[in-house]
UniProtKB/Swiss-Prot annotation:
Its main location: cytoplasm. HAMAP family: LeuA_type1. Pathway: Amino-acid biosynthesis; L-leucine biosynthesis; L-leucine from 3-methyl-2-oxobutanoate: step 1/4. Residues 5-267 form the Pyruvate carboxyltransferase domain. Catalyzes the condensation of the acetyl group of acetyl-CoA with 3-methyl-2-oxobutanoate (2-ketoisovalerate) to form 3-carboxy-3-hydroxy-4-methylpentanoate (2-isopropylmalate). Transmembrane segments: none annotated. Its cofactor is Mn(2+). It holds the Pfam family HCS_D2. This is 2-isopropylmalate synthase. Homodimer.
Length: 517
């Protein structure tokens, strides 16, 4: 009989560590809701002790998520565990995930301890965490390079101490599928009480073997897989959950396991993570890449026309990728727009219909026809804009025709006031950047500027993503328009508003702290 493999998503914890700019609470909630719709069993949503912002996001997500188990990370330190429990206590169900290094290189060079001390810390931390919940996961950090005798010993003691899930991470992506499978097999053969806990694996992709190692672990008996959407994460990333999920579905005949994930939500979740994290999906990415279901060779095309099974082991519809042909114009009503959003997998709670319809009409007047990719891009950008923006564009003008130096004039609403400034720069983007930073009086450095076409042809929308640094933190901004200069202006104003909101949060925290003392 087929057994369930638990899907543990750590996009919002391990995955977020790879981002140039941290996600805000609203963005994390959007990803959490996408994961809940996907049907992941567990979502690890942060490391609460690491910062007030992480605590706030864990607490907020724990309040909102109802159908997935919410988990937070903690070191084997009492205060870490206390803070994690405090952030999670509003959740319907929650798990505390604690970890300790178990390899000699980590124990000796990082912690300056011996293995017996690691054992003592493990026992204490698990027992301490069980004050808050019986759902405790213990991770043997760098298990892939841990002496197998030591690994078996600490796993047995962790289970005896009350851990309900034991995680075996290949922290640096060092092992091969055969080797990693042997590690899991050894645990099942040598730990007498192994059946009292669920064995989990968490594989990194440094050698490109994270998914292979995870599949090998399943074949050896692991029943929880940890990973991230699109495989994002530290260094080369983590196990790509969409690949694991579809490998289990397509090869259930071989693996004899299943997941409870709603596969038709895979593509939608992948797009949400890619857009919010500002990490493009490679065209040849398995499952969710734009070429994943493309066939260009003549022989392949002929075979597909005769029978899709000739060259497709799964269909795009399985992951929620539908061949939608939109023909929307400025004469299309709200019902038509809402229908096409539903066809693309959006729920009404994913977007503000009034705001979306306004920008749709604006775009339709410019382009004539609006296609599915246009509508999806509008919905994403529209959802990033807050109800109240401190900085708002009134108008701008750029002149770069007569010399190497470009000139820009920008008029900006700042709260209830209006300011205008003219600047010059090495190109129109630089000139606009100088004008906006002068008006905002924010000393920012542009770390990244990226332009992507959303659609096809000369009428394609241009999406600009920028990352700026301000007072030791990175902030992300995004803008969308058929005019790439205007997209750039919108992205810069978006990032200025993100910085302004972050400053307001800091002021509020200081005020609350002052009044609580």
């Amino acid at each position: 009989m087929s057994q369930q493999v638990i899907i543990f998503d750590t996009t919002l914890r391990d995955g977020e560590q790879a981002l140039q700019a941290s996600l805000n609470v609203k963005e994390k909630l959007q990803i959490a809701f996408a994961l809940e719709r996907l049907g992941v069993d567990i979502m690890e949503v942060g490391f609460p002790i690491s910062s007030p912002g992480d605590f706030e996001s864990v607490h907020t997500i724990a309040q909102k998520i109802k159908n997935s188990l919410v988990c937070a990370l903690a070191r084997c330190i009492d205060n870490d565990i206390d803070v994690a429990a405090e952030a999670l206590k509003v959740a319907k169900n929650f798990r505390i995930h604690i970890f300790l290094p178990t390899s000699n290189v980590h124990i000796q060079s990082k912690l300056k301890k011996n293995f017996d001390q690691i054992i003592d810390m493990t026992v204490h931390a698990i027992r301490y965490a069980r004050k808050y919940t019986d759902d405790i996961e213990f991770s043997c950090e760098d298990a892939g390079r841990t002496n197998i005798d030591n690994l078996c010993r600490i796993v047995e003691i962790a289970i005896q101490s009350g851990a309900s899930t034991i995680n075996i991470p290949d922290t640096v992506g060092y092992t091969t599928p055969y080797q990693f499978g042997q590690i899991i097999t050894s645990l099942y053969n040598r730990v007498p009480i192994i059946d009292k806990a669920i064995i989990s694996v968490h594989c990194h992709d440094d050698l490109g073997m994270a998914v292979g190692n995870s599949i090998s672990a399943i074949q050896a008996g692991a029943r929880q897989i940890e990973g991230t959407i699109n495989g994002i994460g530290e260094r080369a990333g983590n196990t790509a959950l969409e690949e694991i999920i579809m490998a289990i579905k397509v090869r259930e005949d071989l693996l004899n396991v299943h997941t409870n994930v709603r596969c038709q939500e895979i593509y939608r979740a992948s797009q949400v993570v890619s857009q919010l994290c500002n990490i493009p999906i490679p065209a040849n990415k398995a499952i969710v890449g734009s070429n994943a279901f493309s066939h260009s060779a003549g022989i392949h095309q002929d075979g597909i026309l005769k029978n899709r099974k000739n060259y497709e082991i799964m269909t795009p519809e399985t992951i929620g990728l539908k061949d939608v042909k939109l023909n929307l114009t400025s004469r299309s009503g709200r019902a038509a727009v809402k229908h096409h959003m539903k066809t693309m997998g959006y729920q009404e709670s994913d977007y503000d219909m009034d705001k979306l319809y306004d920008v749709f009409l604006e775009l339709a007047d410019k382009k004539g026809q609006v296609f599915d990719y246009d509508l999806e891009a509008l919905a994403f950008i529209n959802n990033q804009q807050e109800q109240s923006e401190f900085f708002r564009l009134k108008c701008f003008h750029v002149d770069s025709s007569s010399s190497e130096v470009a000139h820009a004039s920008v008029k900006l609403y700042c709260g209830n006031n209006t300011y205008t400034h003219s600047s010059s720069g090495n190109g129109p983007i630089d000139a606009i950047y100088e004008a906006l930073t002068h008006i905002s009086k924010l000393s920012i450095n542009l770390e990244r500027y990226q332009l992507n076409a959303k659609g096809h042809g000369r009428n394609a929308l241009g999406q600009v993503d920028i990352v700026v640094s301000y007072e030791g933190r990175n902030f992300h901004g995004v803008g969308l328009d058929t005019d790439v200069i205007k997209s750039s202006v919108k992205a810069m104003i978006h990032v200025l508003n993100n910085i302004w909101r972050a400053k307001q949060v800091i002021i509020q925290r200081k005020y609350i702290k002052k009044n609580n003392n």
